Swiss-Prot record:
PROSITE patterns: ABC_TM1. It comes from Brucella melitensis biotype 1 (strain ATCC 23456 / CCUG 17765 / NCTC 10094 / 16M). This is Thiamine transport system permease protein ThiP. Belongs to the binding-protein-dependent transport system permease family. CysTW subfamily. Gene3D superfamilies: MetI-like (1.10.3720.10).
Length: 543
């Protein structure tokens, strides 16, 4: 009697794929739910008045959190609009592709590295201060406080907004530009009739996305806040546990942060998401006609200013790092120990993230029920509701009732970083998996190829490059993480970001600059590997 082949088999049998996806969702639910449960139990049975912690300090911190996020979002998008418009108009601008690649780097850089780059340009001993001294107008800019936070957030988010706007520009039909050229429209008329309608549709989702990134910004505010007046909710959570060890205060702050995050995600869902094509946008747009000389000059100036704003802090990291005593730094055992620890934790987190993401993607493809498939599809993204510092705070409070939380530090760092990388890994893996499944499912079913044989012979060649991309991206995110390690780090567990923060705290600025260069090179190398894998995958697809 001939066995009937399974209709869908790829990573494993059809019955086990939804089970594997369910286990991946259970991992995320346990991580987030355990933190929430710990916070709820602490609030309900901790022997303190929960309402008393919702005092003027908490509301002041919450107001500053919202204020700095609103200001950062509006300024980032405001500066991004003319830069994106200029880059789109100057389709043949020399180095346009290089600028777009440069604009992808701030998100790849660990926040701590970028902060050091910003201080090397705008700090009291930075480039601007040196230039003003040379011109005979000495100044000592104060980078710490709201000014430094805004400068750093614009550095991170303005390039992101530019790339998202360029993706929106790609949706404009060629006929619109052709008609504008035939009618002899000026720059203002083109902006009012063609550019602005597209920009206006993208603004709500784009501002919401940048606002979300700024609200959950931890490292930037921790290093550039400069005092109690410039403290956000996440930094206050860290301070209440790490310095004051006040779980009651941490619980109140965490619930406030969680409520704010949920509200932002709800607004994002109602306003819509910005297009994601801008993350890989490198195509040259088609334009009819050419800008006038004055408009072209303006475009070149705008592009140059945007380029300098992003390039100078990155160059500052390189220059400052090279001026450090790298030979002495690399001769220290603690530095190599931190590098090895970071690589080991990053490798483990990336491997776990890719494995769990594959389980979710396979379960979604194998499930016929649309609702269940949607749960598998969106399950990974829901973890973003809880910032890493919130998850870390919950588990820190829970673990202290059973064991020393610092003993569990490696496990917590790996699991939290893996969970935070999963939404991005799923987004990278899903298209390749679905394409391979649509091509091979029927043939494999007819030939009876299933289980490990299908994974080895059919699926793996199709998903190898996307897996490499997801692994490199997840490892880069984990290498630069400071949120979880800031709570669980100790002398027994030192990563590169944690060691860098320690050297900054002890005012060993040259050592910090050298460590920042090492960390930045590691993360950028991983992102370049992921980017090259993406390019190779695209070339193979076109062939």
């Amino acid at each position: 009697m001939t066995a009937t082949p399974a209709r869908r088999t790829s990573l494993a049998s059809p019955a086990t794929k939804p089970v594997a996806g369910g286990l991946a969702l259970a991992f995320l639910a346990t991580l987030a739910g355990g933190a929430l449960l710990a916070l709820a139990l602490e609030a309900g049975g901790g022997g303190f008045d929960a309402a008393a912690n919702f005092d003027t300090y908490l509301w002041r911190v919450a107001r500053f959190t919202i204020w700095q996020a609103v200001a950062s979002s509006l300024l980032s998008v405001l500066f991004a609009i003319p830069i994106a418009r200029a880059l789109y108009a100057e389709a043949r601008f020399p180095g346009r592709g290089l600028i777009l690649r440069l604009f992808a780097q701030p998100l790849a850089l660990p926040a701590l590295v970028a902060v050091l780059g910003v201080t090397s340009i705008y700090g009291r001993n930075g480039l601007i201060a040196h230039i003003s001294d040379m011109l005979g107008h000495p100044m000592q800019p104060d980078i710490y406080g709201i000014a430094g936070i805004l400068i750093a957030h614009i550095f991170f988010n303005m390039p992101l907004a530019v790339r998202l706007l360029l993706a929106a520009y790609e949706s404009i039909p060629d006929d619109h530009w052709k008609l504008a050229a035939q009618l002899g429209m000026g720059s203002r008329a083109r902006f009012r009739l063609i550019d602005w309608p597209v920009i206006r549709r993208s603004l709500p989702g784009m501002i919401g996305l940048v606002f979300m990134l700024c609200v959950t910004s931890f490292t930037t505010v921790l290093t550039l806040g400069g005092g109690p007046r410039a403290t956000t909710l996440e930094v206050a959570i860290y301070q209440s546990l790490h310095f004051d060890f006040d779980p009651a205060r941490a619980v109140a702050l965490t619930f406030t942060q969680l409520a704010l995050t949920l509200l932002i995600l709800l607004i994002l869902r109602l306003t819509g998401r910005p297009s994601e094509e801008g993350f890989t946008q490198t195509a040259t747009p088609r334009r009819y006609g050419s800008p006038r000389k004055t408009e072209r000059l303006f475009n070149i100036i705008v592009i140059a200013l945007g380029f300098l704003y992003v390039a100078l802090p990155i160059a500052g990291v390189v220059v400052s790092g090279l001026t450090a005593d790298l030979v002495r730094l690399l001769s220290e055992r603690i530095v190599w120990h931190a590098i090895a620890t970071s690589l080991a934790l990053g490798f483990s987190a990336a491997l776990l993230a890719v494995f769990l993401s594959l389980a979710l993607v396979a379960a979604r493809e194998a499930t016929r029920n649309a609702r269940i498939a949607n749960i598998f599809d969106t399950g990974a993204s829901l973890i973003l509701v809880m910032p890493p510092i919130v998850i870390g705070a919950g588990w820190f409070i829970l673990l202290r009732h059973f064991t020393d939380p610092f003993v569990m530090a490696p496990l917590m760092v790996v699991t939290v970083n893996a969970a935070m990388a999963m939404p991005f890994a799923v987004r990278l893996l899903r298209p390749a998996w679905d394409t391979a499944a649509s091509r091979h499912n029927k043939l494999c079913s007819q030939l009876g190829i299933k289980g490990f044989n299908r994974l080895r012979l059919i699926d793996w060649p199709s998903i190898r490059r996307p897996c490499g991309m997801a692994f490199a991206f997840a490892m880069a995110l984990s290498l630069g993480d400071l949120g979880t390690i800031a709570l669980f780090g100790s002398d027994a567990l030192v990563t590169l970001p944690y060691l860098l923060l320690q050297r900054m705290g002890s005012y060993r600025t040259f050592d910090a600059a050298g460590l920042a260069l090492i960390l930045g090179v590691l993360c950028l190398a991983l992102m370049m590997i992921a980017d090259r894998a993406a390019a190779s995958r695209k070339e193979a697809f076109l062939q």
